[in-house]
Amino acid sequence: AMIQAVKDGQFDVGMDGITITDERKQQVDFSDPYMVSQQFMLVRADESRFASAADFKADEKLLIGSQAGTTNFYTAVYSVLDGDKQNPRIKLFETFGAAVQALLAGDVDTVLMDASSAKGYIGANPDKLKMLDEALGTEEFGYIFTPGSDLTAPFNAAIKTMQDDGFLNHLNTRWFFLYDANAK
């Protein structure tokens, strides 16, 4: 919905962990990447039936919660399961939050997400969730702009400056990897 809204000019810029892909580049303009992320399996803290994507794939009773059309969905389809987008082992949700709630409730057995998002959910549910160690894919996140936007170049300049002086790495570490949702 966000990509279409920016493409249609409802918004000048969009940013929400949007993965840079060739398909999306046909719809909107992207900034240079501001973050590189990897996909992991978020599971319940007591999960012992599987410890890898291969283990998960082998047990046909296990289900993945995902949001259609996202990088996480395509990672589930192609890196965990059999390449079939209609695979009944993928249960679709409107939001990642809803998929995580289904995971917590036991309705699905894993939700794929980037490490920073997974750590946020784990921080909010420290005794209920964990992340498996196996990285399943790498993606780059970028800001999106209405095609032909004059904002792309200034955003790229700002990203480059923050990369060069280390500030972007500091922000990513501070807010995505050291953040404690339970801190007062």
Where are these regions (language model features)?
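Periplasmic-binding protein-like
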Residues: 36-46, 115-160, 178-184
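Ligand-binding clefts/hinges and TM-proximal coupling segments of bilobed small-molecule sensing domains
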Residues: 71-90, 130-131, 160-184
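Short helix-initiation/N-cap motifs at beta->coil->alpha
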Residues: 1-4, 49-51, 90-102, 138-139
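Hydrophobic residues within well-ordered alpha-helices
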Residues: 6-7, 56, 103-104, 143, ...
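Extracytoplasmic small-molecule ligand-binding "clamshell" domains
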Residues: 1-17, 26
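Flexible hinge/capping segments at coil-to-helix
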Residues: 44-63
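Short beta-strand->loop
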Residues: 59-69, 93
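A ligand-binding cleft/hinge motif common to bilobed small-molecule-binding domains
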Residues: 16-27, 75-79, 104-137
